[in-house]
């Protein structure tokens, strides 16, 4: 599975503290012609160490160059694994929780210069919804995975949204540890997803429409 704790540690991830995987992301909120929002279109770029771990054992036709076809089985495994984590996406429309359908249009590509994988996928909402207020948060409740918006002007955009809709994107705060204290693996091993500890590092998207 894509977020296999034991496998990542065996591959050399630090056992001293979370997180173990870093994801830099961009995305689009997709709207239908009637002004309802239908889902989120993502591009998640994994750190180079995780990318190396994930591609171990793959045999591309050209060494070091992975095509979408080479990565197709891995892409499928990735999106299947993400289901167990709720796709790390928590959305509400007009104050009510939105359920997700399974991802569509998913694929992986590989940047040979930076040696990183990027997972592209569309995450549809179970039903389109006309939302005066839409809030989406992306984070890992257990903070095994660190998510952050790409360092660009507009990491999130609206596609097909009514012109009067206003988008606000908020980046997560940095983790600060008081002097003399450490948040090692023992601390995180006590956590479960229900503790929702990682919510304090949520990447937040807010859209308000008249």
Task: List each model region and its residues.
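Short, solvent-exposed beta-strand/turn "edge" segments of beta-rich domains on protein surfaces
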Residues: 16-18, 30-39, 108-114, 195-198
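Mature, soluble, non-transmembrane domains
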Residues: 94-210
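Structured domain cores in non-transmembrane regions
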Residues: 49-129
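Short solvent-exposed loop/turn micro-motifs enriched in small/polar/acidic residues
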Residues: 22-23, 83-84, 200
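Early extracytoplasmic/domain-onset interaction patches
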Residues: 19-52
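Sec-dependent signal peptide recognition
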Residues: 1-8
